Design a protein with these regions (language model features):
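Histidine-centered, transition-metal-coordinating active-site segments
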Residues: 1-141, 148-638
């Protein structure tokens, strides 16, 4: 993305009607006042205008510039041009967010809702002009900062944030807000018990506790806080801590955090339980405002279509060259409207003119998910990175002393994380310090510090040493095994993987480990678990026996899910569509004829191996022999 000079550049020549309309849209989205603007040139949207103060105090800071070194996708092994980053994505989301917000405001000015006074009012009257202006500013910040805490290498390592540790004092448990949340029932007994259990176990830090400390919003220490992705929680923390001067109070900080995480004020399952007839005027107006703020939140983060998802669908396809359907983002976002779904409630929906674009957006997302994200080459690259990160985290904990973990708030900031070798241990990297953690930092650690400790690192850098998948697609897997056979293979794969794992390397070391576990159970008189371990070992040995050199080099089993179209998701089907002149909105399911598909929740797996000098295995013969061997094992353990 190229940054232009201040002001609006003047283009020579005449504009077409479409260009004139787009230029007018950009002028509207810019909302100029006394503030000066900087101009960014985006390859997809053209000129994007941002306030000079936002550019100077947010975009030009090291915390935001870090996003230039965070790759947007993990598609590069398959599509070499997939080098776009979270920096350009974040600015693109900001741009789309302004268009979406303008559409919501226009709709709010024309849609009415029941008020606490007993009369209908325009939804826009729920907020004053100053409140609308402030809401626009905060929503823009949320769009811009929604990925500011994103982990390196796309989503591969972000789960380490959940167990990460930072040198940040947490003092929420004596906080009056926390005590009030308990008294008001905002936290259930189970939620309080879980927090206390963590404290009793000596836990001193949690990213959810940290976010509560910044926002004073109990939702972030409740069970629903587990729903957002780990990078969303961390992005909230980095945004609110690093750019705290942009927020006036806890309510503003909580609103921005809810926009980034998608945690609405009124949960969908609680919406129908509100007894509007029993509310007084003040309570009624509070509920109305919460419904409106929930609509704003869903512009950035929803389960169906939002500006974050829309940008990456368009940008990924454009950048990597993947041929997909066209998504007219202008038509889609300008179709955003508020719709009344009952006498008392309203929600976000779309005008009928946007139906075709909604279908295209879901098609585009489906195509990317099935043919790009689900490609075995990309899945295996993710496995290599995940294994490398796991080993690096283990080695840092084993050989270094630090108040922080690698994947932590500290590592994302200027403060950084410092890792000192433990006494008596030598490290090729000496004292390590990581700040503004990015892809480059992990690559440095992989190449220069932990190269010998993580065998998968060599396989990551030397692509000609990588394992190959035996079957190369979901379609080929289906052709090799019928439905009943797939169920048996899924059960066998689950036994091999064990609990909570999606990938495992099967080799002699794993077989030895299983044997050790069996001997330990015999010693501890835990005989009931032994047959399960023996069966697991037999499955693993059968796989190795079928490979070249009897699997001396090992094999990787990687579990994944069969493709499931977004069209069959309930929330997509129930998306509200407004037709002028109708009292109630329709749903996408009612008006679209394409909402069909097989809700196939089966799991399947890939097997990655080294072909060796003998060349590739005969896939059909391998599949037949695998089925036969597994049947024999199942029969022996019946």
């Amino acid at each position: 993305m190229e940054r232009e000079a201040e002001g609006i550049p003047v283009q020579g020549g005449e504009r077409s009607g479409q260009e004139t309309e787009r230029a007018a849209d950009r002028e509207e989205d810019r909302q100029p006042g006394t503030e000066r603007y900087k101009t960014f040139r985006d390859p997809i949207y053209g000129y994007i205008y941002l306030e000079e103060s936002v550019v100077r105090n947010i975009i030009d800071t090291a915390a935001f510039q870090r996003l230039r070194d965070i790759r947007q996708t993990s598609y590069a092994p398959l599509y070499p041009a997939a080098l776009h980053n979270r920096f350009v994505h974040s600015i693109g989301v900001y741009y789309l967010g302004q268009i979406a917000f303008n559409a919501l405001v226009r709709s709010a000015e024309n849609q009415k809702t029941h008020s606490g006074t007993g009369r209908d009012i325009n939804i826009s009257d729920l907020l004053s002009e100053d409140e609308w202006r402030r809401c626009r500013s905060l929503f823009g910040l949320a769009c811009l900062l929604h990925d500011v805490g994103h982990a390196p290498f796309s989503h591969t390592g972000e789960d380490y944030y959940k167990e990460g540790r930072s040198d940040v004092p947490i003092q929420i448990f004596g906080d009056p807000v926390y005590q009030n949340a308990i008294q008001d029932g905002a936290l259930s007994a189970n939620e309080q018990h879980d927090i206390q259990a963590d404290l009793d176990d000596g836990k001193t830090y949690s990213c959810h506790w940290h976010l509560f400390q910044l926002t004073k919003d109990p939702v972030f220490v409740s069970s629903v806080a587990e729903e957002p992705a780990a990078h969303e929680i961390m992005s909230c923390i980095v945004a609110l801590d690093t750019f705290g001067g942009f927020f006036l109070d806890d309510l503003e900080r909580a609103f921005v955090a809810r926009c980034i995480t998608g945690l609405t004020y009124i949960r969908e399952d609680a919406r129908g339980n509100i007894k509007f007839g029993e509310l007084d005027a003040d309570q009624y107006d509070i509920i109305n405002k919460k419904m409106l703020m929930d609509c704003v939140i869903q512009l950035l983060h929803s389960s169906v279509i939002d500006v974050d998802r829309l940008d990456y669908i368009i940008r990924d396809a454009t950048t990597i060259g993947y041929q997909s359907v066209s998504v007219d983002y202008q038509r889609l976002l300008k179709g955003i409207t508020l719709v009344k779904d009952s006498q008392f409630t309203f929600r976000l929906g779309f005008h009928k003119n946007a139906v075709s674009v909604i279908e295209n957006a879901v098609y585009a997302h489906d195509n990317e998910k099935k043919w790009v994200q689900g490609h075995p080459t990309i899945l295996y690259e993710g496995y290599l990175i995940q294994e490398t990160i796991r080993i690096i985290e283990e080695q840092l904990a084993k050989e270094y002393e630090s108040a922080s973990t690698l994947f932590s708030f500290d590592s994302l900031t200027e403060k950084g994380s410092t890792f000192k070798p433990k006494k008596g241990l030598e490290s090729p990297g000496g004292v390590l310090r990581v700040s503004f953690l990015s892809d480059t930092d992990l690559l440095y650690l992989m190449k220069n510090v932990f190269f010998e400790k993580a065998p998968c690192v060599k396989e990551y850098f030397w692509r000609n040493l990588r394992r190959h998948p035996i079957w190369k697609s979901e379609a080929e897997y289906r052709s090799l095994f019928d439905k009943s056979r797939r169920k048996k293979l899924k059960d066998a794969a689950n036994r091999i993987l064990g609990n909570d794992r999606t990938a495992i390397q099967i080799n002699q070391q794993l077989l030895d480990s299983i044997d050790e576990g069996i001997e330990k159970k015999k010693k501890d008189n835990k005989f009931p678990g032994i047959p399960i371990d023996e069966m697991r070992k037999r499955y693993c040995q059968a796989l190795l026996d079928l490979l070249p050199n009897n699997g001396k080099d090992g094999i990787v089993l990687l579990s994944t899910s069969f493709f499931k179209s977004n069209f069959v998701k309930g929330k997509v089907q129930k998306l509200n569509i407004l037709f002028p002149g109708q009292n109630r909105p329709s749903t996408l399911e009612d008006v679209s004829g394409i909402l069909s598909g097989n809700d196939d929740s089966e799991k399947f797996f890939y097997l990655f191996y080294y072909p060796g000098e003998q060349g590739p295995v005969a896939v059909r013969d391998f599949a037949d022999q695998l089925s036969k061997r597994f049947d024999e094992i199942d029969k022996d353990f019946q």
